Amino acid sequence: MTIERDAAANTAKVLSEALPYIRRYVGKTLVIKYGGNAMESEELKTGFARDIVLMKAVGINPVVVHGGGPQIGDLLKRLSIESHFVDGMRVTDAQTMDVVEMVLGGQVNKDIVNLINRHGGSAIGLTGKDAELIRAKKLTVTRQTPEMTTPEIIDIGHVGEVVGINTDLLNLLVKGDFIPVIAPIGVGANGESYNINADLVAGKVAEALKAEKLMLLTNIAGLMDKSGKVLTGLSTQQVDELIADGTIYGGMLPKIRCALEAVQGGVGSSLIIDGRVPNAILLEIFTDTGVGTLISNRKRP
C-alpha cells in the first residue's frame, strides 16, 4: 500500500471511530471558554477555529465565551494606565472599563469571529450588552482580619457577577445555525458596564442553556493531585474533598468552583482541558482519551 493510501486509510479509520461520538452529541450544546495559550499561538488559533466549524458541521452546537486579560493588560500599559488586582480580579475604574470594552468587544471578539468565519463557520460576536445577554450586578468583595469586628468592603469598581442570561437570544442564534461568540461584559440594571471573569460567564451560560458540556481551555494538563499526576475523571463529591484537603488551591480554585457549580446547576459535565494541545476540543469530544480533567455528577463507586 502506498504512503498516500496509508494516510487515506488512517483518515477513514479515525472518521469511522468518531461516528458513535458524533451521534451522542448531535443537537447538543457545548459551551467552550476560550483563553490562555490557545488564543496566542497562530497554529492553535487556527486549530480552534477549525474545530469549532467542524463541530457545527456535524450537528453539534458550540457556544464560545472568550477571555482577553493579556490583551487588556497590553493596551493599558500602552496607554500608561496602571493595573491593580485584588484577589486575582482586575480593579476596574471607569477609564479601565472603557479599555476592557474596547479590547474584549472590539478587538478580541471580532478577531475570533473573523477567524471562525474564514474557516467556513457563521459566527456572531456579542457582548453582554446585546439584547441584555448577560445581566449583571456589582460584585461585592470583602476582607476581614482577626482584628476586625466587621468585614471591610473593598471597592474594585466595575467588576460584576452574573444575574441572568438571555437564553432566548442564544437559542435563536443556535437554531439559525450561527455560532455565538461572547465577550464577558455584563450590563447592569441602569445600563452600566461590568467586567466579569470569563470562566464564570461560561459557567452561567452553560447552566442557563442546560448544556451537555462546559469546556474550560487552560494552560495546564488538567487538575493534578499532590504528586503531580493528572486526575482524568472526578465526581462532584471528589472535587469537594480535594478542595477541603487543600489539593485544589490558589488560582485554580475559582476555575474549579465554576466547573463544579455548572455540573451542580444541570450541565452534563465540566472539563478542564489543556488548550496547548492541538485539536484539544475534538480529542475530548470524539475520543475516550481526552486531554484534561472531567467533572461529572456520577456517583462514586
Curated annotation (Swiss-Prot):
Gene3D superfamilies, sorted: Acetylglutamate kinase-like
Site (Transition state stabilizer): K33, K255
Keywords: Amino-acid biosynthesis, Arginine biosynthesis, ATP-binding, Cytoplasm, Kinase, Nucleotide-binding, Transferase
Broad class of where this protein is predominantly found: cytoplasm
A Pfam family matched in the record: AA_kinase
Localization of this protein: Cytoplasm
Disulfide bonds: none
InterPro entries: AceGlu_kinase-like_sf, AcgluKinase_fam, ArgB, Asp/Glu/Uridylate_kinase, Glu/AcGlu_kinase, NAGK-C
Cellular component, GO annotation: cytoplasm
UniProt entry tagged with the keyword Kinase: yes
Origin superkingdom: Bacteria
Sites where the protein binds substrate: G68, G69, R90, N195
Pathway(s) the chain acts in: Amino-acid biosynthesis; L-arginine biosynthesis; N(2)-acetyl-L-ornithine from L-glutamate: step 2/4
EC numbers: 2.7.2.8
Enzyme class: transferase
Reactions that this protein is recorded to catalyse: N-acetyl-L-glutamate + ATP = N-acetyl-L-glutamyl 5-phosphate + ADP
HAMAP family: ArgB (MF_00082)
Functional description taken from the UniProt entry: Catalyzes the ATP-dependent phosphorylation of N-acetyl-L-glutamate.
Family stated for the protein in its record: Belongs to the acetylglutamate kinase family. ArgB subfamily.
Stated name of the protein: Acetylglutamate kinase
Species whose genome carries this gene: Pseudomonas fluorescens (strain ATCC BAA-477 / NRRL B-23932 / Pf-5)
